[in-house]
Amino acid sequence: MGKYQVMKRASEVDLSTVKYKAETMKAPHLTGLSFKLFVNLLEAPLIGSLIVDYLKKDNGMTKIFRNTVIPEEPMFRPEFPSQEPEHDVVIVGEDESPIDRLETALKCLPQYDPSRSLHADPVSSFRYWKIRDYAYAYRSKLTTPLQVAKRIISIIEEFGYDKPPTPFLIRFDANEVIKQAEASTRRFEQGNPISVLDGIFVTIKDDIDCLPHPTNGGTTWLHEDRSVEKDSAVVSKLRSCGAILLGKANMHELGMGTTGNNSNYGTTRNPHDPKRYTGGSSSGSAAIVAAGLCSAALGTDGGGSVRIPSALCGITGLKTTYGRTDMTGSLCEGGTVEIIGPLASSLEDAFLVYAAILGSSSADRYNLKPSPPCFPKLLSHNGSNAIGSLRLGKYTKWFNDVSSSDISDKCEDILKLLSNNHGCKVVEIVVPELEEMRAAHVISIGSPTLSSLTPYCEAGKNSKLSYDTRTSFAIFRSFSASDYIAAQCLRRRLMEYHLNIFKDVDVIVTPTTGMTAPVIPPDALKNGETNIQVTTDLMRFVLAANLLGFPAISVPVGYDKEGLPIGLQIMGRPWAEATVLGLAAAVEELAPVTKKPAIFYDILNTN
């Protein structure tokens, strides 16, 4: 008989006895021919199961799911108790139109001052153009949406000649973009723009439905089996505000990776260093924003897929509370860890896009009973209106578990500035069972994904998937029903730990990632790669927000010694997006000057 352990209930665990254990995931790093051979072995009937069982045992998953008694009941999706109202916020209605919510959001921002952007000294420092810069330029007749569209199209059409290629987009229709831009230009000529998003270019990740494009999820074949009949719920809201939908962004195939590697369409390069990954899976969304081609994009986040590429590309990425945005019309619809959220070149722009797309589905309103959406009051340029004296939870040993001290040092510098400038208090916390959380997340995201795609795989489409997706699926197939139930018992247990932490702090702060953008191995471009250590480093801090459904944001806080961006993650209580956004605004003001990426297009330069 094998040995087993019995966990105490979470309420009985003495946190003073918890010891931090650095993650050391074990698996070979493979690319090229060796990777192809490894995948073929994984999929072989007998030897494949032996390899998978060995990897799971060697990385502690067998012990967690087969040799542990977990006393908590399962929680199959995030469940939140009712929350205390956020302080000094503006409450908006779930049923308000996106246009009305945008008007409310604009009133929460500092008054627009063209001298700080469009009329600022162009050589003093680099800056990204914001949504309100475009809106002002259109209203002032400095340019038109059609002129901007033609400039963007000319750049996109040159992508195929870039060395190395920069495939930001999977689907792009120049005629469709021109059609939208002409309609927006007419509205401005008639003095009737719909909203501040009228004429603003937004890119949509390829797992979110957006007419007239098919949705492939980064595959080459999914459109053959899944047709797109209408816009997704979030895209419909953006379209109703006058946004110009640029196309479908590249992504790590089916969201099954954190680097952004995609051998089907080419791997998107990091605008700060084209030899490096963007992070994923919302790789194209992050890169096209970081490169200046559009102010914002939509991504999905099931395991850091908005926050990781945002951090690695030096932009802002918001992961909303589970259920805050309607997932209808996305490949993630029906999942228990995924959300749709904005990626933007500034906190302000992420806030505006969030204001447009928020709104729970009718099912989530009934089941989750979300608190009313709230906006922070960002009425000063230093964010002081929005944060007050927040308590910032920091688990120091975890916070410092990064590949380079540059990351923890830059994040620590910002925490000190928040304390000195805004009176925030850093509170030491303990986050138990991080290894168990990683294991529970793998099953919670992997099993539903595999289940939704199994009919296609059984029909022969598995061979059309990339090798890294096939690696993930081979592991997911090994999980049993009892493994899945055990993971959901861990979800309830981990929820109790975190809700108790939030009794003593307002947010939990960490670096967004445990490393900056990794180098792309040349052999990985054709057939992908498997590198569990890179995956572990990139996902180290992001999982609680997905497994437990909390809101979280990545905001840039500086650069490492190689000039690569570093992100700070702020994770809040359920439904507390206003707190997270308000603190992120203060961080943005305190962070060092933004560096111009190596790949950047100055779309709105009217000089």
Curated annotation (Swiss-Prot):
Active site residues of this protein: K205, S281, S305
Residues engaged in binding substrate: G302, G303, G304, S305
Protein name: Fatty acid amide hydrolase
Knockout consequences: No visible phenotype under normal growth conditions. Enhanced sensitivity to inhibition of seedling growth induced by exogenous N-acylethanolamine.
Top-level lineage group: Eukaryota
Effect of S305A: Loss of activity
Major localization listed first in the record, in broad terms: endoplasmic reticulum
Gene Ontology cellular-component terms listed: endoplasmic reticulum; endoplasmic reticulum membrane; Golgi apparatus; plant-type vacuole; plasma membrane; plastid
Biological-process GO terms, alphabetical: defense response to bacterium; lipid catabolic process; N-acylethanolamine metabolic process
The encoding gene: FAAH
Tissue note: Expressed in roots, leaves and flowers. Expressed in seedlings, flowers, roots, siliques, seeds and leaves.
Protein purpose: Catalyzes the hydrolysis of bioactive endogenous fatty acid amides to their corresponding acids. The hydrolysis of endogenous amidated lipids terminates their participation as lipid mediators in various signaling systems. Converts a wide range of N-acylethanolamines (NAEs) to their corresponding free fatty acids and ethanolamine. Can use oleamide as substrate, but not indole-3-acetamide, 1-naphtalene-acetamide, nicotinic acid amide or L-asparagine. Can use 2-arachidonylglycerol as substrate. Participates in the regulation of plant growth.
Complexes and interactors: Forms homodimers.
Single GO MF annotation: N-(long-chain-acyl)ethanolamine deacylase activity
Keyword line: Cell membrane, Endoplasmic reticulum, Hydrolase, Lipid degradation, Lipid metabolism, Membrane
Catalysed reactions, as listed in the record: N-(5Z,8Z,11Z,14Z-eicosatetraenoyl)-ethanolamine + H2O = ethanolamine + (5Z,8Z,11Z,14Z)-eicosatetraenoate; N-(9Z,12Z-octadecadienoyl)-ethanolamine + H2O = ethanolamine + (9Z,12Z)-octadecadienoate; N-hexadecanoylethanolamine + H2O = ethanolamine + hexadecanoate; N-tetradecanoylethanolamine + H2O = tetradecanoate + ethanolamine
Record-linked PANTHER family: FATTY ACID AMIDE HYDROLASE, TRANSAMIDASE
